[in-house]
Amino acid sequence: MIDTVHNNTFDAASSQEATCTEFMVPMRDGVRLATDVHLPAGFRPGIDAPLPAILERTPYGKRDVSRSEINRGEPAAHRGDIAAYFVARGFAVVFQDCRGRHASEGEFTKYLSEGPDGYDTLEWITQQDWSTGRVGTMGLSYAAHTQMAAACLNPPGLVCMVMDSGGFSNSYQCGIRQGGAFELKQATWAVNQAKGSQAVLNDPLLKAALDAQDLREWFSRMPWRPGESPLRFVPEYERYLFDQWTHETFDEFWQQPGIYAEGFYDTMARVPTVLMSSWYDAYVRSTMDNFAAMSKLDPVAAPTYLIMGSWLHGDRNVPFSGDVDFGPAARIEGQIAEDWLAFRAQWFDRWLKPATSGVKQSDPVARIFLMGGGSGARNGDGRMEHGGAWIQSSQWPLADTRFTHFYLREGGVLSETPPEESDASVSYAFDPSNPVPTIGGALTSGAPVFEGGAFDQREDERFFGTRNPGVPLAARNDIVVFETPPLEEDMAVVGPVVVRLWISSDAPDTDFTAKLIDVCPPNTDYPGGFAMNLTDGIFRCRFHNSWSEPEFLESGRIYEITIEPFATANLFKRGHRIRLDISSSNFPHFDVNPNSGESPALARAPRIAVNTVYLGTEHPSHLVLPIVPVNALRSLEALTDPNHA
């Protein structure tokens, strides 16, 4: 099938025609994947000089409008337009539907086929007479996961990658599960994307049945069970969702190349890579773990670069996240590059074309958006002005980082001074029928049930599970709050965050959660102040000794646990407070622990747990923050060189 694509969106240089030819590319098991190859109009394979290729593998439709290609002030672009842009610059462009999606054959099992299928696709590209055999990959979210999955198998032809907001380092700890709990974005994504499955697209009655499902109502009836879920009409999607949900221990299921780069770092493709994410994205930990590991593989021949913004998942040109505005500087355009297309074009020029391959650039290794420093007032769009600025570094964490302990003290105090009391503790009752509602955070794919971002931590009718609109979460009896006095000077927190607790419970299993908050003082616009969530995490206590061999708790026995919220970068201004909220649920971000020892995916007998956090000298529960001297921060150099990439 041949189409001609005309580009009317970008500059005149990309307006030349490009031809699009669809191929059904066979994989090693005989399943064929629908693959569009975009070449210059009139290109003669085998006669004209071959071209380097850019590959994106996606489950979202290779010919559909691409959410990942939104530029400021413009609607999302069609993938044909994106292809024409790169074709005009001397590349072949390949878009492919993932297995079981849209025009491709086979059954869709989320993530698990992407390694072998990516390998086979890259091998096919290298064998085509229009190809130089040099391939760069790109893509957002799932299309970043597909890149990392293929790279784990060290495929032929792979020369460089641009991974935006994805690429699992260890999906058991970020992206599917976290701290032993299940991330329920997998459930919302499955239901929403099942509507685009081949079975649903080919059956109007099936489509009507799936469209009729009220997902918010289904979330109020959790846990689901196989055959008793909104996915019961689309069994291949229900099957893979419950595989993820019920595989609670870290075993061989979680060690496959599509979801576990950690197990392949030593043998994976060593190629130049850009890793990009953002503080309210669901893949902060994956991005940071991948950066830490890949930076060491071959830093000279295969450098790895890090870009961390303030935005939600993939919203690189949106200056706000939730109810908080970070200012126009938060956009990638004009800060990191002229625009995202130009950034990638320069990147692929640098690594895929012989004339420019290997040319040295002076890019910072890490470009980080430091949130904070704004007025704290409400802007014209109704968002709190938190502000921020880009900084740069040659490493992560930053060189001058001082990892500082803040101890949880009696009376709700968070202090650098260790406790003096020997037996201090605080207890609360956790009722799984009344979980703490999720109010923002590092979330994606949650519509129509939940949303990510930065919000004042008070209940609001916008958020699923709200029972008392307008009331601060801190007023709940099952949340324990610790905060510093107002800061006497600005404090920059940039890096990984760790919460170490000594706990006990009268239940055989329970969860503990931790949320780091910047408490902005009261002002005219926010007379009650603004408690802005920065990052949070969770720990399922049956894994206190091992992720692979769970053990129930003994009632009353004290255990040490570690919660690892995602890394962050925030300037706490003078007069602000640092706050840590401890609780035992965060729903619907995570599934709710029934406290009974049952699997949360299948529980039938939930119970109330009395949970205790210890604060004394023998069990000094504490928060560890990465503090960087404000005067040691290096501002990102202004973008003046049009060839800066």
Where are the language model's segments positioned?
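A catalytic-pocket lid/entrance helix-loop region that shapes and gates access to the active site
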Residues: 138-213, 279-280, 298-346
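A short loop-to-beta-strand scaffold at the N-terminal edge of the catalytic core in hydrolase folds
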Residues: 29-45
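Active-site-adjacent alpha-helix of alpha/beta-hydrolase-fold enzymes
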Residues: 78, 285-304
